[in-house]
Amino acid sequence: VYGLEPILETMLNVSIVIPAWNEQERINDCLLNATRQTVMPHEVIVVDNRSTDSTVAVVEQFMKDHPEAPVKLLHQDDEQGLIPTRDYGLNHATGDILGRFDADCMIRPDWVEVVSGIFTEDPDAMGATGPVMYYDLPSRHFGLRGDNSTRKRIYRADDGQPLLFGSNMALRATAWREIADEVCQDKADVMHEDIDISLHLLGKDLKTVYCPRMIAGISARRMDTSPASFLNYMRRFKNTFNAHPQHYRKHKPEILITALYPVMHLLYPVWQKVLNTADINPAEAAWINEQMELA
């Protein structure tokens, strides 16, 4: 099982790359979770992309308050967009393994340890992903089990190779360098950039793996978008595979996700009011029990 071997001096180190655009609400919690780990990451790189809110100030304050944390702040101001910002961070990272997730993601306290273990134990693994827990929905851990059972079965391409999920993914640095100049820049912004990375890896016969113990908490805020916006987002699955006709898939995750949308669209704002009334920060509380065990 991936990630179960004891941590040794030979374990590969892990850089974390977090693209950020106007993420003042969640970036501090994201950094707390990224640095409250059983194994400290080699570095945590926040790449700001022309934020107009206080994202930069929040990150700078975090670095001041936590000088021992290996957090770095970079700026990608040449071009607005997730892909150039992501690429800038990955290209500047210096670790053996490059973790990448969004600024509203709260990784489990053993995430770095598990990710390091995956790639250390399997030298053929070039990309890795795992399930997610929706921290701002009720029954979070039940949702995690559901996500795991579904994602490991249907989030795949070609002959069953796992597709990486942008909210919870890692690449071997050598693998990234092999595809960095080839990944789609998607100027029209119509594709899923994480699936695009996955397909470029598979196109070079580079192995991707799925690890149930590689867990990240993410927001379900996508369910709060308008029906038109949501359906447009779902079309990105098809658009990405259409851009890579040499690859195929047996399952279409967007069908299941779209089926869940009506109920989740109604539930999400109601649950946010419950959390606000109770003065609960769901991102801060995502892994509080696990973090207490580290204290």
Where are these regions (language model features)?
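A conserved acidic beta->alpha catalytic loop
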Residues: N33, D48-A57, D78, C105
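Acidic donor-binding loop at a coil-to-helix junction in glycosyltransferase catalytic cores
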Residues: A188-I197
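Short aromatic/hydrophobic "clamp" motif used to bind/position activated sugar donors
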Residues: L98
